[in-house]
Amino acid sequence: MVARVWSLMRFLIKGSVAGGAVYLVYDQELLGPSDKSQAALQKAGEVVPPAMYQFSQYVCQQTGLQIPQLPAPPKIYFPIRDSWNAGIMTVMSALSVAPSKAREYSKEGWEYVKARTK
């Protein structure tokens, strides 16, 4: 009984995380135009490092541990607009071709089975 409840809880937690991720992507319009994706990435780049620093300071205060100061991350310019939409297009293209490819492969497999059974 406990194993079933635990597996159900794991499923619900994973589903909640996945649903939250899908909602966040939809809410932030990350699958839309590239400029919005680029703006979201820049916004995350500005917000995450200070938040991580504040969290590490909080952990130091609460636990008494001394976390060594890490060097600042290098500033790297990566034009995400060039690769983000290319990745999305590749995935969507593969998904749109999948049914016809599955039909072709199953037809080839059926022909192979028919040839072997004769």
UniProtKB/Swiss-Prot annotation:
Residues 1-7 are mitochondrial matrix. Component of the mitochondrial contact site and cristae organizing system (MICOS) complex, composed of at least MICOS10/MIC10, CHCHD3/MIC19, CHCHD6/MIC25, APOO/MIC26, MICOS13/MIC13, APOOL/MIC27 and IMMT/MIC60. The MICOS complex associates with mitochondrial outer membrane proteins SAMM50, MTX1 and MTX2 (together described as components of the mitochondrial outer membrane sorting assembly machinery (SAM) complex) and DNAJC11, mitochondrial inner membrane protein TMEM11 and with HSPA9. The keyword Transmembrane applies. Component of the MICOS complex, a large protein complex of the mitochondrial inner membrane that plays crucial roles in the maintenance of crista junctions, inner membrane architecture, and formation of contact sites to the outer membrane. Constituent of mature MICOS complex, it is required for the formation of cristae junction (CJ) and maintenance of cristae morphology. Required for the incorporation of MICOS10/MIC10 into the MICOS complex. InterPro entries: Mic13. One of its GO terms (cellular component) is nucleoplasm. The keyword Mitochondrion applies. It comes from Homo sapiens. This is MICOS complex subunit MIC13. GO terms for biological process: cristae formation; inner mitochondrial membrane organization. It is a single-pass membrane protein. The chain crosses the membrane at residues 8-26.
